[in-house]
């Protein structure tokens, strides 16, 4: 066992040769490297599989009762200062390593087919391998210096991956937005590290925790300064894990390829912030203000992410806001003292969200030959629908991922989310009510996404999209329609004009531009043809295999944390796994409950989830297809004060969700413009005032010199006479005025 731990330092560097080989190959032999580009997927997957096996071995040893292992190598700079580098193997490290490698392998296998026709195929695999290296280095770090080094590398890789298609201006802006937003968090993290080194004199975790806890208990440190330093450390996690108010980069990060979105949202960048909070929780627990702040920002993010997902039409952006909300749950858990539930939900959400993102990539892949290769079309759920018969395997896997995220038993996220909800009742009833309500919203917007994508009919096939003639195609729009006639707001099932596109969960009708209309007309001319190439097709087996594997994880990974305490059985593997870390936090490690208590607690949360699914099915399902007479529907929808008031409320909710809660507008209006205004004011002051003074002195000196040079008439003797006269005058003034006072 000791032998295995000693060589754990190699874990982060195993995937690195792929990045180096691709870089050197493109530099030295670019033609041969590009001709053999498809071969690079094999070493990428193989090397990461080696890390997975190594991590699995370490995890088994941790579960069987091994203690925390730490290896340090000291680099002495002088007698007063030395840097220690090494690796730390504990339950948190082993959990994160397993998570990173398993999700990473599935994403790499998926990407081999998804990116096969992209010119940046080699660059993609180089970035992905380096991202895995950076994240593995982060989770095995034994001190804050290593954490910061790999933290910056993770941010750099995310910048490169989000801006992978950097020739697209929107992608270039998205990666810059992510980079700048995370600079705020990284700056706070660096200041926090320096502050804690000043307090404790150590950056190594064990010494840091022990010294800081002793100082807090003996009042050996200023509590305000300690709280400030802890807050700065937490700011780094807030930015990385897209917590309010530094969450604005996450939806725009969807401009990268879909496999990148799956990796970032499941196992790398957004997981890094949660990992940092879990790693530094022994510091945060002794500062109540920080724990309260963690739980507060967590619950705000939970609710905000769910509300912003309600009106999204882009399938990837909907999943992005879902990630934001679920990370809020994961951040809420450590804030309320539920360390185990936080890591449990991090695990279950990672596999479910990876499944959903890769499933969305399969959907996008099937839609691109029909609607074109623009993300505005291929990712638009308004143009989807009825995909069940075209992509049945993708549909089944996506449904299971959706049900898992909704919290439906026995899928993975049910077990972890239910534990967080139960613990939130013990912490604060207000927080618990918000968390439970958001569980219902999660079920609503996730099933909305599923129904718009797979149920009904393929929306783009209807002739009203082609512009050829009117149709009786009806769309559900609970937001109402914008127009001068009152009757337009009367219909829940509204007939769309031939130049208008269906706006699900939207209050507005958008005109279809000429290019889209021509594309749709081209499709409609082939509609009566038997050529099946114009229909969505199921993805290749290389893309379906990772989906099926992730389905297995989604089905069974929740079993590692089942908290049942039965005689002769021990289901709770996760608690055994986390025992050393829980003991370090001095918490009660007894998480077991009996069957009756568990079922009683679960009924409430599952009922809320089913209610959200029911509402989504009512509004977006096929229930309206049975009503052939619109008057039957309209008879239930009469214009009146209550109806108008309800419309106003719905429109307010829609505007809030569609406009991202106006947070981006606020930043653009006050922060960005304010900084630019300050920069312009500073530039004006520098050019007009500072430069004006210096240039004015120079110009004045020039003209004075030009004026007095004629006094001497051009003769040296005259210049000397004038010079000596002035010197004598100043000396006399100095003598009589200053010395005789």
Swiss-Prot record:
Broadest EC class assigned to this enzyme: translocase
Naturally occurring in which organism (per UniProt): Liriodendron tulipifera (Tuliptree)
Top-level taxon: Eukaryota
Catalytic activity: a plastoquinone + NADH + (n+1) H(+)(in) = a plastoquinol + NAD(+) + n H(+)(out); a plastoquinone + NADPH + (n+1) H(+)(in) = a plastoquinol + NADP(+) + n H(+)(out)
Family named by the database record: Belongs to the complex I subunit 5 family.
Cross-referenced Gene3D superfamilies: 1.20.5.2700
UniProt subunit comment: NDH is composed of at least 16 different subunits, 5 of which are encoded in the nucleus.
This protein's UniProt keywords: Chloroplast, Membrane, NAD, NADP, Plastid, Plastoquinone, Quinone, Thylakoid, Translocase, Transmembrane, Transmembrane helix, Transport
Gene name per UniProt: ndhF
Full protein name: NAD(P)H-quinone oxidoreductase subunit 5, chloroplastic
Biological-process GO terms, alphabetical: ATP synthesis coupled electron transport; electron transport coupled proton transport
Keyword NADP carried by entry: yes
Protein function: NDH shuttles electrons from NAD(P)H:plastoquinone, via FMN and iron-sulfur (Fe-S) centers, to quinones in the photosynthetic chain and possibly in a chloroplast respiratory chain. The immediate electron acceptor for the enzyme in this species is believed to be plastoquinone. Couples the redox reaction to proton translocation, and thus conserves the redox energy in a proton gradient.
């Amino acid at each position: 066992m000791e032998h295995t731990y000693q060589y754990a330092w190699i874990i982060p560097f195993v995937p690195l040769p792929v990045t180096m080989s691709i870089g050197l190959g493109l530099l030295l032999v670019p033609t041969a490297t590009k001709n053999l580009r498809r071969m690079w997927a094999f070493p990428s997957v193989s090397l990461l599989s080696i890390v997975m096996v190594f991590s699995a071995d370490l995890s088994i040893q941790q579960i069987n009762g091994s203690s925390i292992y730490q290896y340090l190598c000291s680099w002495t700079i002088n007698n007063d200062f030395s840097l220690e580098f090494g690796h730390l193997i504990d339950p948190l490290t082993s959990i994160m390593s397993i998570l990173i490698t398993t999700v990473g392998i599935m994403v790499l296998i998926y990407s081999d087919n998804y990116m096969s026709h992209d010119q940046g195929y080699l660059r993609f695999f180089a970035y992905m391998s380096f991202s895995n290296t950076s994240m593995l280095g982060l989770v095995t770090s034994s001190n804050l210096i290593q954490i910061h080094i790999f933290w910056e590398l993770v941010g750099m890789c995310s910048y490169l991956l989000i801006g992978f298609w950097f020739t697209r201006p929107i992608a270039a802006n998205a990666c810059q937005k992510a980079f700048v937003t995370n600079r705020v968090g990284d700056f706070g993290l660096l200041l926090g590290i320096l502050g804690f080194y000043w307090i404790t004199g150590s950056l190594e975790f064990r010494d840091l925790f022990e010294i800081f806890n002793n100082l807090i208990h003996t009042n050996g440190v200023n509590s305000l300064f300690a709280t400030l330093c802890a807050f700065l450390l937490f700011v780094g996690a807030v930015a990385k894990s897209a917590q309010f108010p530094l969450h604005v980069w996450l939806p725009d990060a969807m401009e990268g390829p879909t496999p990148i979105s799956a990796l970032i949202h499941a196992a790398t960048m957004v997981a890094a912030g949660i990992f940092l909070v879990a790693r530094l929780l022994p510091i945060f627990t002794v500062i109540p203000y920080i724990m309260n702040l963690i739980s507060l920002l967590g619950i705000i993010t939970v609710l905000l992410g769910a509300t912003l997902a309600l009106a999204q039409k882009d399938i990837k952006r909907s999943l992005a806001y879902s990630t934001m909300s679920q990370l809020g749950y994961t951040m809420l858990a450590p804030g309320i003292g539920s360390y185990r539930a936080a890591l449990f939900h991090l695990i279950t959400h990672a596999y479910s969200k990876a499944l959903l993102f890769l499933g969305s990539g399969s959907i996008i892949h099937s839609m691109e030959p029909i609607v074109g290769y623009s993300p505005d079309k291929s990712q638009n759920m308004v143009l989807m629908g009825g995909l069940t018969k075209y992509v049945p395997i993708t549909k089944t896997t996506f449904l299971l991922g959706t049900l898992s995220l909704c919290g439906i038993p026995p899928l993975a996220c049910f077990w972890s989310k239910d534990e967080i909800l139960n613990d939130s009742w013990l912490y604060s009833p207000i927080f618990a009510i918000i968390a439970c309500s958001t569980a219902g919203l999660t079920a609503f917007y996730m099933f909305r996404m599923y129904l718009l994508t797979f149920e009904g009919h393929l929306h783009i096939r209807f002739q009203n999209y082609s512009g050829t003639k009117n149709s009786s195609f009806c769309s559900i729009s609970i937001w109402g329609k914008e127009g001068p006639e009152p009757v337009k707001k009367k219909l829940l099932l509204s007939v769309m004009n031939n130049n208008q596109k269906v706006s699900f969960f939207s209050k507005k009708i958008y005109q279809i531009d000429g290019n889209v209309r021509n594309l749709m007309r081209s499709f409609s001319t082939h509609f009566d043809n038997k050529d099946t190439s114009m229909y969505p097709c199921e993805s290749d087996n290389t893309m379906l295999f990772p989906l099926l594997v992730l389905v297995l994880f989604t089905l069974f990974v929740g079993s590692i944390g089942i908290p049942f305490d039965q005689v002769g059985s021990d289901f709770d593997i996760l608690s055994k796994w986390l025992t050393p870390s829980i003991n370090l936090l001095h918490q009660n490690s007894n998480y077991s409950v009996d069957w009756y208590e568990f079922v009683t607690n679960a009924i409430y949360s599952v009922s809320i989830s089913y209610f959200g699914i029911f509402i989504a099915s009512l509004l977006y399902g096929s229930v309206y297809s049975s009503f052939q007479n619109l008057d039957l529907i309209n008879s239930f929808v009469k214009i009146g004060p209550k109806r108008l008031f309800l419309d106003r409320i719905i429109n307010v909710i829609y505007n809030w969700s569609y406009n991202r809660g106006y947070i981006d507008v606020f930043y653009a209006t006050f922060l960005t413009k304010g900084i630019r205004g300050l920069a312009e004011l500073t530039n004006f002051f520098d050019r007009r005032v500072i430069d004006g003074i210096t240039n004015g002195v120079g110009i004045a000196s020039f003209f004075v010199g030009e004026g007095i040079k004629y006094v001497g008439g051009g003769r040296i003797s005259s210049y000397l006479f004038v010079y000596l006269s002035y010197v004598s005058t100043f000396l006399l003034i100095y003598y009589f005025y200053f010395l005789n006072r």
